[in-house]
């Protein structure tokens, strides 16, 4: 066991969940000043997950932007897919980009997420100053539509 080990890390990730999404604060990076806690991990044998690796196949652009009868701004990618969205923004520190994902619209043409069975399927990106690019590091969804909740 080391006696004078000092490890530090920093990240903008505030919350990360496979189904619910990611909250990322870009003003917190790259701060490598948070002490790391060393602890005894599990002793169970790890088993490799079987199946295809998830990797990017192609990039798609938004096909249409529209406003729903409820007054929500929605981006339509023209097809249902599995993926993530990469943000390109020019913003001020503290500005927030808040997006929700859906596969279908309801019969009135409004944003619909009930089929996600409780998964939030959202990105919350807190901006730093200037031009920035970001995409989540763990989360991806099945979606066709993105609702812009805040920007």
Identify what each model region corresponds to.
Residues 1-151:
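Extracellular/oxidizing-compartment recognition motifs
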């Amino acid at each position: 066991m080391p006696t004078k080990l000092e490890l530090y890390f920093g990240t903008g990730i505030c919350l990360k969940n496979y189904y619910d999404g990611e909250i990322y604060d870009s003003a917190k990076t790259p701060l490598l000043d948070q002490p790391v806690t060393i602890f005894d991990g599990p002793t169970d044998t790890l088993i490799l997950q079987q199946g295809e690796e998830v990797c990017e196949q192609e990039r798609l652009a938004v096909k249409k932007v529209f406003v729903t009868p409820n007054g929500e701004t929605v981006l339509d990618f023209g097809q249902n897919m599995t993926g993530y969205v990469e943000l390109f923004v020019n913003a001020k520190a503290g500005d927030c980009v808040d997006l929700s994902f859906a596969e279908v619209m309801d019969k009135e043409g409004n944003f619909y997420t009930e089929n996600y069975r409780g998964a939030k399927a959202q990105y919350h990106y807190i901006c730093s100053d200037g031009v920035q690019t970001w995409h989540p590091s763990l989360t991806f969804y099945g979606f066709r539509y993105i609702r812009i909740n805040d920007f």
